[in-house]
């Protein structure tokens, strides 16, 4: 039997073969096909600026098949949620692949652990929002409703690395027909190491018998396969997060070359909300938020949208030359 | 220098010594002292049934000091959040030690990832809740406001195992003055293994150099120290979660004896919302929820409140005999 060309062969293929199959796979595939069909061909001169797949939040690595313990990656989903809002504002349709429970577009302002603190009951038991929060809550409800009602936002949740990579593969191959109109904005914090499903403990690991030793395998580098096979014409933006600033830009440039990204956005854990560096084959651009009240994502998305439209134009020029 | 008697010496002491100190320690200590003082002496014949410390959600084990990756324990916080509601209803004051981002009392009904789906804007831009949800949202706001306004709910958040155990120690020693009026209801999913802070990687672990090997140490068993030193007269309820039903009750009984708990609540991952078994020195009691619309916690808390009031009475009888 020939290797499935969408899985990239080798390590990636065996990763997908061993992964527990995605629940709701058929429903997700249907929703995806509808969403892409509805928005394909409307880019370029059309109303829509493009279709972007935003990934957001951290993936987990289960340590047990009936999972009690897992390794997680730090990520609130703030970056992906904020970016989704700015992509929608810029006229994109967004496929939002997000970690269950992570930050959601238009909900970022909410108090983390008690949404009830936002509300009070009026004298006639009507639900009221204190004046101080009313404007921001109303704007959030309005923008969210608009995105949903106009069919511009498709939300696909994941928890594990297995779910995430299967979703990315499905979205990647579904968006291939969009060619250069498609963009990937890969802000999720993806596990580098995992325990292969078949070698995983079936039950909760016993704690009575001394220290725990674990060996984890490397997750196959799917960026490469996304770029080469799933959606080769798309505009690809990936992220590189490090805690050590001395190696950050160097690693971002290595990723740019190794995976053929259009942009690698480099950020440090200590100040990722304040500043990012866009690394491209033309050099580096530092993006800083003007103040603590602003989002660094606003300017970042502006710049990326511009670069993406150049990426689309390039094709149009190429086509023009041929005719 | 003599060993600090509140830390339990040995392993526990070295765990606390090496742990990064709790942020806001002074503020938390102040809030705790106020809360306990306000509610002490009001139990027994008084208005208040008692003071309970409910722990909820999973603890994380950081794998790096500037933490990007961590091991997490599966727990939505559903059990602790629901139980807190029923304890408040039964007339308890509740200290709710919860994992940041986990389920909160009176918010359990919310759609997990999009609270905005609950709301819409009316014609005059007023915030409306669709009729279908209005009753439940209003009840939630009313009950939550009542608990907060009457000072019956103190919420203390944690993320890591280091924060959790430091909070438990602070609450344990602060509640000691309540004697038998105090209850611990330890529903949090606490890590069994951890990486000692001083042996932890400082920066994000590199992924380029092949598989990852990790060795994790056992977390000292703090239940024992809670029972023996921090709050020896309190009524103590702990939980035992397993995925393998064959070893569950046996492990629950071992925990009952080993840590001197009053009750160990045994539950299986597969059906923890449907059924639990209360294990005590007098035997086992199975608690099942009557239907999917009910909470198993309702009956569980009823039974525990009854047992706790017997535990309090016992002291009163002992005192009576002496006079």
From Swiss-Prot, chains A, B:
<comment type="pathway">
    <text>Cofactor biosynthesis; coenzyme A biosynthesis; CoA from (R)-pantothenate: step 2/5.</text>
</comment>
<comment type="subunit">
    <text>Homodimer.</text>
</comment>
<keyword id="KW-0173">Coenzyme A biosynthesis</keyword>
<dbReference type="GO" id="GO:0004632">
    <property type="term" value="F:phosphopantothenate--cysteine ligase activity"/>
</dbReference>
<dbReference type="InterPro" id="IPR035929">
    <property type="entry name" value="CoaB-like_sf"/>
</dbReference>
<dbReference type="Pfam" id="PF04127">
    <property type="entry name" value="DFP"/>
</dbReference>
<protein>
    <recommendedName>
        <fullName>Phosphopantothenate--cysteine ligase 2</fullName>
        <ecNumber>6.3.2.5</ecNumber>
    </recommendedName>
</protein>
<keyword id="KW-0436">Ligase</keyword>
<comment type="function">
    <text>Catalyzes the first step in the biosynthesis of coenzyme A from vitamin B5, where cysteine is conjugated to 4'-phosphopantothenate to form 4-phosphopantothenoylcysteine.</text>
</comment>
<dbReference type="InterPro" id="IPR007085">
    <property type="entry name" value="DNA/pantothenate-metab_flavo_C"/>
</dbReference>
<dbReference type="GO" id="GO:0015937">
    <property type="term" value="P:coenzyme A biosynthetic process"/>
</dbReference>
<comment type="similarity">
    <text>Belongs to the PPC synthetase family.</text>
</comment>
